[in-house]
Amino acid sequence: LLDYFNKEKIKNNISIPSNLVKSKYTQSCFNDYGNSYDRICIAYKKNSSKKTIEQIQAQIRYNKDVMNTCRKKQNKIDKELSLLFKNLERKEWGKLPLGSLKDQDPDAHYYPITYEFADKSRAQLGCYSIYSKTALKIGVYNLEFGKVIRK
């Protein structure tokens, strides 16, 4: 991470989601980064001086609940990913609750699609509904980080 951002920018952009609060990970998010997505988030170990990237995620955030729009975009990207990852195991999980948000937003849910690599790391594409707003998130994470976010 330090090859791309300085320590001050990383520190000033820390944004910890509820599923990472009690973990050994944190993340920094950068808005308006790139042309295709309006936000990227990069997770790393809290006490790591090297700030090795454990997950990278790009997001398109919608200011309202537009799940149908998100799902259409998700399906389009999924078709591209299925060509890129044709030898990987693909799983469409259906609608799942976001357990880490159940106290703040009991209706929070998402529709993940994953591609699993040989080392059990994953690429994931999902449409999320949180606080009546929709977000498309696409990312790649290693196995160790995956175990934390699957809880």
Question: Across the structure, where does each feature detected by a protein language model lie?
Answer:
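N-terminal leader/targeting segments
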Residues: 1-52
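Weak global preference for isoleucine
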Residues: 10, 14-16, 40-42, 53-56, ...
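Long, charged/polar, surface-exposed segments that mediate recognition or autoinhibition
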Residues: 37-104
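A charged, solvent-exposed segment within the mature domains of Sec-exported extracytoplasmic proteins
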Residues: 75-150
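Processing junctions and N-termini across compartments
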Residues: 23, 35, 63-64, 121
